[in-house]
Amino acid sequence: MRRVFAMLQAGMMLNPGLLAAAPPPPTVKTTTPIRHLVIIFQENVSFDHYFGTYPVATNPSGEPHFKAAAGTPTINGLNNALLNNNPNLNPLNLAGATNPFRLDRSDAATNDQDHDYTPEQAAFDGGLMDLFPLNTGTPGPPPGAPPIADTTGLVMGYYDGNTVTALWNYAQHYAMSDNSYDTNFGPSTPGAINLVSGQTNGVIQSLNGSGSIVPDGNGGFTLNSDADPVGDVCSTSSGETVQMGGQNIGNLLNAAGVSWGFFEGGFNLSIVNSNGSTGCSRSTTSAITATKKADYIPHHQPFQYYVSTANPTHARPSSVKLIGQQGDGANHQYDILDFYAAIRAGNFPAVSFLKAPGFQDGHAGYSDPLDEQTFIVDVINFLQGQPEWANTAVVINYDDSDGWYDHQLGQIVNTSAVPLADVLTNGSCGSGATALPGINSSTLHAQGRCGYGPRLPYMVISPWARRNFVDHTMTDQSSTIRFIEDNWLDGQRIGNGSFDTIANSITQMFDFKQVDDNDLFILNDKTGEVEFSSSSN
């Protein structure tokens, strides 16, 4: 409670009664009460890796305690059969064959798993979901974890509400999905591109190699792995870089005069960190992982891949008042600190994409769930202290699964048949004959976009979110685009083969007939425990 009072004195929280008084921007029309959407786009987590045993936590002594509220809905998680007789006991997994097992809070720092396009499909084994250790598993957490974690069986590990405490508490108070997916199989860059365009076809330039692209079946190429954006001053000078054609959601928002921005840690190259690092080498060493990581990671910044929305030199906004607006040299691409500065100056963009500094983005190998928790909680606590909170929604979503085990096979809504790349079932991902189009009208069925891929967490946090609600509607990363299009753009779609044309809505996670005007739900950014709640839930 002392922390709550400190935040009140610092201006981080407002009188709850003032929340309803926040006026909507006069020039922006929306179809819902949501005037500000903040997308926190994190890294490399499958649904079961964070929520497999929700809402039941082990609660060992000395760790943050979690107890679910009465009436908490059930989820499609790890049932007794999956926990005790899992298909990944398959002997083909060799020493890594194992049931799922709990990773303790002290095991927050783990190795990165294999999460490329083809290994993820191979792990699914035609829907048997039984070859994760063989295909995506990588050993290596710190000492003290179960011995199986020193094998490829680490991929079967999961956290519960004693480690990912904040996310479990947000799920109790707001809305989550247990049926949301990576739009395609594969790693960070395709996931980031799908977040903003729903279309990984249309690579128009590839330099220094071609390992991240596959033929689309019509003379063009589809992005299915990681590569830095062409022209970004922080991109690799020797590794592969690519550039995308087509439109993204930023183009549509610009045409409609809707303010928006992508805010990523480390984007401002003039800042000097406390360790003396600056420029593209700005870095932070996590106390949890003991790993130094660059704050800015080029292949996590999707708008940099499009000439129309790129800020290749990382030019600074000419004024805090112009953040989110057209015609400024920053071209809607900013540092994460600019997000806070703009809102404090009374300039809250309608649509904001947030990317944490590397050490806080949740990516195993250099980040972890505890550093990630600090970032997420700090953002949401800050937003709840703003007068605009009454008309704000926060989406928490992920770019890929990192290859971590999840038991649920999603529906394959888009097929692909690229030899050697697509191996989901019998050497392909369906026939590819019904695949969505590419960005060019002549590419009727663009290959290399097998999906939906692995199941990922998806949460909505807002005074308008349903309380303690689990949505079972099938959604994907491009469902966020669809909400933006429906709310600000009168349902206009990106088109040209974008998944936004087939994505389901997230509106069922809201209750637009009822709002909690006094909504405040403040968590501790280190433990994830509730420090203040204005409601009983």
Can you annotate each of these PLM segments?
Residues 2-10:
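Sec-dependent signal peptide recognition
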Residues 20-537:
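N-terminal pro-sequences and low-complexity stem/linker regions of secreted or lumenal proteins
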Residues 9-17:
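Hydrophobic core
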Residues 4, 16-20:
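Hydrophobic membrane-targeting alpha-helices
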